[in-house]
A protein has these predicted regions:
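Loop/turn elements at helix/coil->beta-strand transitions in domains of secreted/extracellular proteins
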Residues: 71-75, 115-121, 163-169, 212-219, ...
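Hydrophobic membrane-insertion alpha-helices, especially the h-region
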Residues: 28-43
């Protein structure tokens, strides 16, 4: 409604000012919200890595031939998705329960092992023997299910003859590289908190079970490394607020644990005098042998997926087969 100013002139400003100010506030609020959203969506690069260049000395199998074994050997691989893709022939994803005939990221390990004279068998999702492959699960699995593991043909189906597996390969998934702390030993057989100390406890518990089966070679494959990708700021903030696992901090802890597994002098097998246990360091291989504490072969559009890509799986196959050929001779399974 028109009003008179102090000079008696008609003024329209008073009646319009509240509406104009409200509109400006709304527009300003929307702009601020859009700006804040854009900032939170900005990618945040992880800080530079602080790498420990100290190298451990793994077990040396060079005294043994890496040629194919002189007799057929049965091999069981207990795995989930990464192991299934590693075994698979390259091609479209074709399989179920992570037992693939072909896979986009296939590493061709099954074909390579078969060509070297191994009979390859698998247990994965959808089976009692293939379930529960986290680090703390292994002691209970081998303690309670060892006979079934050794007789496993595929999933929970045993061999129809009286034979057993000569080799048992077991591997946890990359989630078991997401360590939360170093921590002190818990004394509870590993527990469910993934610390370096608890993981060491779990693997120490395996050795008495393996010692009871000197005729079987047990191959521990280290878990693949975590992908260290760029993530939006809002995810980084949310993880901090929710106290979720810190991927950056987990890398050095995963390196510490896997170095311990493979260190022949001071590690897991330093005091184990039998020859029926070996460690294949897939973690180190997929970090380009210590060039990072994280995966150098990730998948996903931005490298955010920790499943190894085809190049990483093929590289692992090229290293694993001669390693296994030497390990079976060291274990006395063939000449």
């Amino acid at each position: 409604m028109p009003t008179l100013d102090r000079n008696g002139q008609v003024s329209l400003q008073d009646s319009r000012r509240p509406r104009t100010l409200t509109r400006r506030r709304v527009i300003g609020g929307l702009a601020g919200g859009l700006l804040a959203g854009a900032v939170l969506a900005l990618p945040v690069s992880p800080p530079p890595e602080q790498l420990d260049r100290a190298k451990v000395k793994p077990m040396n199998f060079n005294a043994f031939s890496d040629a194919a074994p002189s007799q057929p050997l049965r091999l069981l691989f207990i795995h989930h998705s990464c192991g299934g893709q590693w075994l698979a022939t390259p091609g479209p994803d074709d399989g179920e329960n992570c037992i693939y005939r072909t896979a986009v990221n296939g590493g061709g390990l099954r074909d390579a092992l078969t060509g070297a004279g191994y009979s390859v068998h698998e247990a994965s999702y959808g089976s009692r023997l293939g379930a529960a492959t986290d680090v703390p699960d292994w002691p209970e699995k081998f303690r309670r299910q060892m006979d079934d593991v050794l007789r496993c043909d595929r999933q929970d189906t045993p061999y129809s003859d009286s034979g057993c597996n000569d080799i048992v390969v077991f591997k946890s998934c990359f989630t078991q590289s997401l360590f939360v702390a170093a921590d002190a030993p818990s004394g509870n057989g590993g527990g469910w908190r993934l610390t370096v100390a608890n993981a060491k406890d779990a693997y120490r518990e395996l050795l008495p079970e393996f010692r009871k089966r000197p005729e079987t070679l047990f191959v521990a494959v280290t878990a693949p490394p975590i992908a260290r990708s760029v993530e939006p700021l809002y995810k980084a903030v949310a993880k901090r607020l929710l106290r979720r696992g810190d991927v950056t901090a987990s890398g050095p802890l995963a390196r510490e644990f896997n170095n311990w597994l493979t260190d022949a002098k001071n590690g897991w097998l330093a005091d184990y005098d039998a020859t029926n246990v070996a460690v294949f360091d897939l973690y180190d291989l997929l970090t380009d042998n210590g060039e990072s504490n994280f995966s150098k072969y990730p998948t996903g559009r931005r490298g955010e997926d920790s499943h190894p890509n085809a190049a990483g799986n093929r590289r692992a196959t090229a290293a694993f087969v001669p390693f296994l050929n030497q390990a079976v001779r060291r274990a006395g399974l063939c000449n």
